[in-house]
Amino acid sequence: DRRFMLVSNHLSRFDPMICMVRFRRTPLAFVSKPGNFKIPLAGAFIHKCGYLSIDRENARNALTTLNTATEYISSGRLSVGIYPEGTRSKTGELLEFKDGVFKIARDSHAPIVVMTVSGTENITHNFPFRPTHVDMHIVRVIQPEEYAGMRTGAISSMVRKYMEDDLATQDRKNQNDTTAAVIS
């Protein structure tokens, strides 16, 4: 029942919805760009779910959003999901992380659930006629004791390394599966 901070790589606009299904028994809100709140119907839905708008162009407003996310977790209201890359990756490669987002976990003393996703980038191309295989891996749950006293940049580097290692393992597995299918 403990609230946590969920961090994941970001490939598609469908990532938060897929995560909400995966964590359906956990009250979970994401930090999202302001434009998403202007999308008809979807904007009202994410607002009602407690999503937080982050203004990446205004440091003071962004800090207010991070503080609100910290309060969500600390008060037990919601767990918070965030994409430390700050935007979707068009190539599937991890983009540079925004270290400041880890202030949420550090200040709320919350576990960090490290997750990777793959396949969500294909949903738009396949919908509605072909199903899309999506993989979600809970890579690691980092307890607050493991990052106590660390700066946000160090926490960011640790999380990124876990994600990179998991994505590399998935790539190797997928290459082996493809090779096995060709040989069969």
Predicted regions and their residues:
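A short, glycine/Asx- and small/polar-enriched loop/turn
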Residues: 1-3, 130-131
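Non-catalytic C-terminal accessory region of glycerolipid acyltransferases
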Residues: 63-184
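Catalytic core of membrane glycerolipid acyltransferases/transacylases, capturing the structured
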Residues: 2-59
